[in-house]
Structure formats: structure tokens, C-alpha cells
Amino acid sequence: QTSEVGMCGRYSIYESMDDYLRQLALDLVVINGYDHERINRYNVAPSTRVEVIRPAPGGLNVDRVKWGWSPFWAKGKRVDPINARAETVMTGKFFKSLWPNGRALAPANGWFEWIPDVADPKRKQPYYIQAADGRSLFFAALAEVHPGLEPDERSGFVIVTAAADEGLVDIHDRKPLVLTPELAREWIDPGITTERLAEIVQTGCRHSTDFQWFPVSKQVGNVRNQGPELIKPV
């Protein structure tokens, strides 16, 4: 299906997990197995499974987890949310079981936003947003993971989103809480204090000057389209 999605409803992750781990520069080993090939996903959509990095006793885990999560008491009442608002994630009831111990990182290369078309405001134009220096991004995330051979329906993750007034392409929009590698390391440090976590949530998002963006093909609206042409400027 074709849909125009708000922030942050689609993103790309196309390097190998080793590249993201190298940029994090953690002195921790990944204690579970993961794929070393390039991930090559240019259009990650909600409810699909995608790689996240999370702390584990003795190191890190890399897991493929469904993007979208609800607590057990809200399952099936609506579509699982894919984002958690920075303003309420620490205090709200909905994410209580994930905060703060479900902290994870969703590595990415960029994300998409849809902006009303100047020529025809009823239509929307997708834009792709990436780091101006071309390096990887780390989205602050919260995850519930139940490892096993089969995906567990309780497992899922959400991306934390930053306040609307710091939007990029569209001033009214929200953006993922994008962390520098330094803050990303802190985010998944088991020893971090809740006060420091609150600081990162409130002020840790990389500034809009760190990013560049450009219009891309409307093909990204269809989740079946997955190739690198989706992130080429039009």
C-alpha cells in the first residue's frame, strides 16, 4: 500500500552492523550472533523486524525486533505505536515497563519525512534526512525483547522522538532523538543515572545543523520498494 507517514515513519539502515558498532566504539563484545553482511534496507516500515543494539549482562546484544510496541494491557486496542514522545516517555503509564531498563539504540543512515507540496498542498513530497557528514545515526529507542527461534509477539521497540520546535524540514514536525556516538554510548550504559538520562532525553538530540535533506521519489511511500534509488535526490 502507499501511505504518507509522519515522523519518523520510515528510515534506512543499509551498512553492516559491524560499521555501526565500529562508530559506537564501545569496549563491549556482542554476546549473541548477528549477521555481518550489509543490511541494505532503504525503507524500513513499521511492524517489520529490524536490528537494534541493547545492553546485556557482559556486553551487548544485537536483535532483530519488530518496530512498534504496546504494553500487554493495550495489545490489540490500536496499532502498536512506533514512537515515544520525549516529553512523556519518562513519566507516562504507556511506556512504564520499558523506562528506563528497556533502553536500546536503533542504528540508521537517515529517515524520511513527508512535507506538503508547495504546488499542490493536498499532496505531500517525501524528503530524506541524513547526517551532513555522511556518518551513521543512532536513534534513542526503547525495546522489549524475548529471544527465541520464533519472533515473540510481546517483543517490539519504539524510537524516542524530540520536541516539535526542533523539527528539521518541517518546523511543525517531530524528529527522532538522534544521539552522537558519545551520547549513544551513555544511553546504553547500565550505570547511567536517571537524572543523566532525563538530560539526554531533553537536550541530547543532535542539532538541525548536523543534517542535510533533499526531496526523493514518492516510491518510498510503497513499503514494497526497498532499493538505494529511494534515497537519491530528485
Q: What are these regions, as identified by a protein language model?
A:
Residues 1-234:
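Short linear sequence motif anchored by a di-proline
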